[in-house]
Amino acid sequence: MIEYRDYPYQSALAPYIRDYVSEKRALGFIYNVKSYQLFRLDQYWRDHKYDDPHITLEKLDEWICALPGESKSSQGSRIGAARDLAIYLNVHGIQSHVPIIYVGKDHPLIHVLDKTELKELFSMIDSYVPRSTNHEDFRMADEYPIMFRLYYCCGMRNDEVCSLRTSDVDLEKGIITIYNGKNQKDRLVYMPGDLKDLVCKYYEWLIRYLGYSPFWFFPGRNPDKHIPKHSIDRKFRDYWLMTESSKHCDKAPTPHSLRHSFVVDRVNRWILDGIDINFMFIYLSKYLGHKDPDESFYYYHLVNDAFRIIRQKDTASEEVIPEVRRR
C-alpha cells in the first residue's frame, strides 16, 4: 500500500501547493519527495513574510543558493520543486517566475539504439557461431537471442532475465512473473505474441537438448546455475563490436540500453498516436518495476530521440513533457 506523506503548509502558497500535490497524486505520482521540498519552500515563504503567491526571481534569490554542505542533487531538487510549482501557478493565472537553473550532477547520455543499429546487433546475435568446441557454448549461443529480445521487447533488466526461473514463465499465457525485483517489487511482464511464440519454441528445444526441464530458464555453462550477468555484459559488447555501427558510435551501449530503447520506442509510439502519456506512464512504470512514473519519465528525458519526437509534436510538447526541451 502506498503511503503518502502530507505536510502542514501554512504560507500564502499553501492552498496552491496542496492542490498541486493532490493533482499529481491523482495522476499516479507518489510525490513524497517533491511534497517535502514544497513544504520547505512553504516554510521559506512564511519565514520571509511573503504575503502573496506570486513567485519572483527576487523572492527566490536565497532559495536557489546552495546551503552549507548541501549536495548538488539536493539543491537541484529544491529548485526543481519551485520550478514545478511556478509552472502550475502560471497555468492557473498567477504570474510567476520559472527558475531554469539546473545544478544536479551530470548524467551520462544514454545511447538508445536506432532501428539500423538494432537490426545489425540482432543479426550478429542470431548468426553467432562459437569458436569453442564446447557443446555448452553452442547451447548458450542459442539462449542469447531470446535473452536479448526480452531486454528490448519487454524492457526487462539484465539480472531479471539471467536469474529467470522456469516456474516464473507461463508459456501458455505469455506472462513472466518477476519476484523481488529492484525496490523489492513483484510484477508481471507480458510478452508480445511473436516473442511468446519464439520463447515457446526455445523452451521446447531446451528440454530436448538437456533431456529435462531445467530449474533456470537460461542455464549457464553448468546447467545447475543460470547465466551470470557479467557474461551477458561481455557477450553484448562482443556482438556490438561486430556491427558496422560500433565504428561510428562514441558512447557504446550496454544491455541496459535495450531497456531504454524499449521505453523510448513505446513512448514515441504513444506520442505519435496522440495518446496521453501522462496517463500511460502510470502503467509503464508498473510494467518496468519503477517506484513511480517519475522514474520512467527520467528514462525518457535522458535520450536524444526524445527531442526528435517532441519537436515533431511541437504543439503539444509543453503539456506532454514540459522539461525535455529545456535541457
Functional labels for PLM-detected ranges:
Residues 1-327:
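Conserved catalytic core of the tyrosine transesterase superfamily
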